[in-house]
Amino acid sequence: MRARNLMRLASVASVCSLIAACGSSAPADISAPTASVGAIPLLARASTRRLLDWPEFGLNPQRTDVSESATDITGANVAHLRRVQLKLAGTVDSSPIYLHDALVGGAAHNVIVLTTTYGKTLAIDADSSRTLWTFTPSGYQNWAGSAQITTVSPLADPDRRFVYAASPDGLIHKLSLAGGSEDSAGAWPVSITRDATHEKLGSALNIDGSDLIATTSGYFGDAPTYQGHVVLISRSSGKLQGVFNTLCANRRTIMVPSSCAQSDSAILSRGGAVVEPGGGRLLIDTGNAHWNGATDFGDSVLELAVPGLTLRQAFTPTDQETLNASDLDLGSSAPALLGEDRIVLAGKDGIMRVLALSRLSGRPPSSRETLGGEVQRLPAPGGGELFTAPAVWRRDGRTTMFVADENATAAYVMRRGRLYLAWENHTAGTSPVMAGGLLYVYEPSAGGIYVYHPGSPSPIAKLPGAPGHWNSPIVVDGHVVEPEGNANDHSLSGTLEIFSAG
């Protein structure tokens, strides 16, 4: 996860030549077979159901970022939404969440909840744009304005009474939705690192049954020592239910980072841990670090069993050493669940890898981890580095995936376990979302949200906005909500865009 290497390989082709030289058993070609846009299902109209809540990054624990339910925003009115810009007491370099008709301050509100890079969590009325409450973590003044930040998206408890949020001191907080007060019962708030100055809380929180899932990474520049790890936290008590360290994996507690001989292996993706359908298993992937297939898992995809967070199987590409040496983190984007026993991931090398979920390494799960085994490799959109989360739409037995990166936005369809490129344009984007039959992609360099019909690379509208970084929108209950700004600017202010129908 080191800062972008100025000597980075100039193109996907040059990376491909290095991979070919490795003599892998992986597919030899790196190409994008094509399909017509007609392969993308038609959605004549949104479901009669309305999408009222957006409780976490990716909408659900599987991080699909897709809902066919109606949002009250259509192709006919999307270019005419009412725009409100709010100045915030901090930058939100992540995504917000939303709850319809939530009880706050004794009254029902349609509530946006978001967390700034220095750990302030705010609840905002989506209709009036009024701030309902602000939670400021203890110690805020100690890191405000510094490089010690968080980019964690908050998560709403299914009971709608609490929200969970992170702060740069390594704590996960349980906050009352009614007023923003901190729940200190049991073990709350929960520390998930022994050194918050080196281990960053960067990826979105997730949930699996009674447990909250959180992960750690490193800061920009990769100052050692840190180890990416994932933790399970009881939502009720705050008790740690499990820990998996991606380095020194034989140690099952939260370590002092300097006590492990290896460093890095960040879990740095926007999506963090992805929960498989039905729960009980989750997927993570890691950034640059040492790999030995036993205790150290740099540049790998790991499937962990819940509740013990035991390693079930793993995938590591044959060119892992090259990725590590060249700062080409495999895990810059989380695994995306495609269905039909397939997942896909893409990293900073500009290559998407399709894996069989039942056999990540191409072999039955076992304690002996080996290199290689992907089903397919193809270029990321425009050959770009991928730091975003794909959106995956399954309809009528077909899978469509939307991906955006620093170079392009693209749509892929899956046939017989392989991905085919249906369309691509040259517009950069962060994590796409599809809601109510429309696709929304925030463009972080120039700002603004491009809106598409899923079957076309030509936008039907662009919502105005300012530049950002990893921010991505949500579209729910008649609103498009998009935070703006870059965490690496270390600013104490930011902007929130709210576009509303009616």
Where are these regions (language model features)?
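Bacterial signal peptide processing site
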Residues: G23-A26
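Bacterial N-terminal signal peptides that target proteins for export
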Residues: M1-V12
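C-terminal motif of bacterial Sec signal peptides marking the signal peptidase cleavage site
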Residues: I19-A21
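Post-signal peptide N-terminal segment of mature Sec-exported envelope proteins
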Residues: D29-L51
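General structural concept
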Residues: S94-H100, I112-L114
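Predominantly extracellular/luminal regions of secreted and cell-surface proteins
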Residues: T48-A70
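Extracytoplasmic/lumenal domain signature
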Residues: R49-R50, E68-T91, L103-A108, G119-A147, ...
